[in-house]
UniProtKB/Swiss-Prot annotation:
Cross-referenced Pfam families: LYTB
EC number(s) per entry: 1.17.7.4
Name used for this protein in its record: 4-hydroxy-3-methylbut-2-enyl diphosphate reductase
Pathway: Isoprenoid biosynthesis; dimethylallyl diphosphate biosynthesis; dimethylallyl diphosphate from (2E)-4-hydroxy-3-methylbutenyl diphosphate: step 1/1; Isoprenoid biosynthesis; isopentenyl diphosphate biosynthesis via DXP pathway; isopentenyl diphosphate from 1-deoxy-D-xylulose 5-phosphate: step 6/6
Source organism per UniProt: Chlamydia abortus (strain DSM 27085 / S26/3) (Chlamydophila abortus)
GO term, biological process aspect, one: terpenoid biosynthetic process
Cofactor note: Binds 1 [4Fe-4S] cluster per subunit.
Length: 309
């Protein structure tokens, strides 16, 4: 008999729940259309559902008619976007994750104090673009350990570092170690920039890996935290697949023996996770499902003031 070990926490985090509720509440309060800058979260199922309900996802504010309402995605935006929205008389609502906003504020503060900011993250990720926009002349993005050796700062330059919220804890630890080795005086926030949900999902998966021979991460290919979950398994030599629907689960799993771990990125709906479990049961009729609870999450973020009742 084979088992699926269902990692917990998995799926939606508080920031994703808040962001989706912002769009839903705006549609309920004002009706369609509601414009959203960038995908509200990186999950095709969520985005397609909101499109059906009247949300219009855009990348350029020029696609929003003057005077209309626009929501900023959970990933955050650079300040210039707010300025453009104001100039075009748009009614903007900010669904940026509270934990991303914290990093924006820290970058702005330390740049104003004369620090050079090291931002650990993926240069092209929308979250990193938004954070860097707070102080573009002061922020240098570092993606990997090798980048640290190429930094131009000498030991007399005041340095502060933060990270993208959805990175691999393994990668962050390696880059942080390299930064501190080269710049012992570098400082950072009192708590990790990697968000609680990213940490919990990675650590929960790590806890079950010794018991499994294969991992499914349910999440969108665009989702940074979903990709990092896949890497957590692969770095420990456990085969892993990132899938976003039951249609992506093939009979490949029949070529592997032993138990299977299932986890999901922070923007993956629970009903998609359960449909993937059902697909596995079709392929393996005697499959048993076991929940592994690493920790419980009770974090709730308040909606923007424009949508509070």
């Amino acid at each position: 008999m084979r088992r699926v070990i269902l990692s917990n926490p998995r799926g939606f985090c508080a920031g994703v729940v808040r962001a989706i509720q912002v769009v839903e509440s705006a549609l309920e309060k004002w009706g369609a259309p509601i414009y959203v800058k960038h995908e509200i979260v990186h999950n095709r199922h969520v985005v397609d559902d909101l499109k059906r309900r009247g949300a219009i996802f855009i990348e350029d504010l020029k696609d929003v008619p003057c005077g209309e309402k626009v929501i900023y995605s959970a990933h955050g935006i650079p300040p210039e976007v707010r300025e453009e929205a104001k100039a075009r008389n748009l009614f903007d609502i900010d669904a940026t994750c509270v934990l991303v906003t914290k990093i924006h504020s820290a970058v702005k503060l330390y740049a104003s104090k004369g620090y050079q900011i090291i931002l650990i993250g993926k240069k092209k990720h929308v979250e990193v673009i938004g954070i860097r926009g707070e102080a573009p002349e002061s922020v240098t993005v570092v993606e990997k350990v090798e980048d640290v050796a190429n930094l131009p700062f000498d030991i007399h330059v005041p340095l502060f570092f933060v990270t993208q919220t959805t990175l691999s804890l393994d990668d962050v630890a390696e880059v942080t170690q390299a930064l501190k080795a080269r710049y012992p005086h570098i400082i950072t926030l009192p708590s990790s920039s990697v968000c609680y949900a990213t940490q919990n999902r990675q650590e929960a998966l790590r806890a079950v890996l010794p018991r499994v021979n294969f991992v499914y991460v349910i999440g969108d290919v665009q989702s940074s935290n979903s990709n990092r979950l896949r890497e957590v398994a692969e770095k420990r030599n456990i085969p892993a697949r990132l899938v976003n629907s039951p249609d992506h689960i093939s009979d490949e799993i029949l070529h592997y023996s032993g138990d299977i771990a299932v986890t999901a990125g922070a923007s993956t709906p629970e009903h998609i996770i359960q449909s993937c479990i059902s697909r596995l049961k079709e392929l393996i009729p005697d499959l048993q499902v076991e929940e592994d609870i690493f920790t419980t999450e009770d974090v709730v973020f308040q909606p923007p003031k424009e949508l509070r009742t």
